């Protein structure tokens, strides 16, 4: 209902920063797959200082947990000056970005207490999936089976996470002593796992104060592999999809 009265954009620019930018990158894959919509993720602090080319039928989606991120707010204002429709995806109700946007979708995740965004980031990803499903259906490109399966998977997600957390904590406790002395980490991902690799590296930096870099798996051979040594941990995010064999190849 938040975007139901707005036209379907010919191109969507997702403008965000940090965790929100990674959520936007992840959403790009879903929008391209389900809605066949051209999507350009933009880092807010870069977007606002470029001589950006925006068309009147472009739409801008700005993502911010706080709704007060200065660079994202400035990018929103720039887009509106150029005549673009602007949608805000925010968590804090009544903050500056939602007030200035043409439409707003609230994640309603509650106050974000931790330094590293957790529930806000997860909520943004869920909303991005719903947006992709909505536009895919509205454009008549998404079959009912895919939509129903995706919605059922989203409904089952809380239970899946709850069931998986004990084993994940146990694994983390087992691995942490092995890698506690490491000075750098790589996080690798391909396709829609790449934004999550970037997010994993950011989380390690924010929480543990350890240097980490996220890379697209295929980019390893173009320089970063030169840094790999026996005591350089690498985490590979490899989903069980068509890219799985390829990810294993680069990981090995």
Predicted segments with their positions:
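Glycine-rich oxoanion-binding loops at beta->alpha junctions
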Residues: 28, 32-63, 211-227
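Conserved small/polar residues in nucleotide/adenosyl-binding loops
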Residues: 250-251
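Short, structured coil segments at secondary-structure junctions
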Residues: 35, 56, 82, 99-101, ...
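Active-site phosphate/pyrophosphate-binding segments
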Residues: 1-13, 93, 103-235, 243
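Pre-Walker A segment
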Residues: 2-19, 25, 39-40
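A structural-propensity feature for long, helix-poor, extended segments
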Residues: 59-66, 230-240
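Short, glycine/polar-rich helix-capping loops at beta-to-alpha or helix-loop-helix junctions
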Residues: 49-50, 88-100, 222-223
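Short glycine/serine/threonine-rich phosphate/pyrophosphate-binding segments
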Residues: 20-26, 68-75, 97, 193-198, ...
């Amino acid at each position: 209902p938040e975007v139901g009265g707005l036209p379907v954009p010919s191109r969507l620019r997702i403008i965000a920063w940090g965790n929100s930018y990674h959520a936007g990158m992840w959403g790009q894959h879903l929008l391209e797959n389900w809605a066949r919509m051209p999507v350009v993720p933009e880092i807010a602090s870069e977007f606002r200082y470029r001589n950006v080319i925006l068309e009147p039928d472009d739409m801008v989606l700005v993502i911010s947990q706080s709704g007060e991120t200065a660079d994202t707010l400035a990018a929103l204002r720039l887009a509106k000056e150029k005549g673009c429709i602007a949608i805000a995806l925010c968590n804090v109700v009544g903050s500056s970005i939602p007030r200035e946007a043409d439409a707003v979708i609230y994640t309603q995740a509650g106050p974000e207490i931790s330094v590293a965004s957790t529930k806000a980031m997860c909520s943004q990803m869920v909303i991005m999936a719903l947006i992709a499903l909505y536009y895919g259906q509205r454009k008549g490109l998404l079959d009912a089976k895919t939509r129903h399966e995706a919605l059922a998977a989203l409904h089952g997600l809380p239970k899946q996470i709850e069931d998986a957390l004990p084993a994940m904590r146990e694994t983390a406790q087992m691995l942490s002593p092995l890698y506690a002395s490491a000075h750098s980490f790589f996080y690798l991902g391909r396709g829609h796992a790449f934004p999550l690799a970037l997010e994993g590296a950011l989380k390690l930096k924010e929480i543990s104060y350890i240097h980490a870099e996220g890379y697209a798996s295929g980019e390893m051979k173009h320089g970063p592999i030169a840094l790999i040594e026996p005591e350089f941990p690498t985490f590979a995010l490899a989903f069980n999809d068509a890219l799985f064999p390829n990810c294993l190849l680069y990981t090995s």
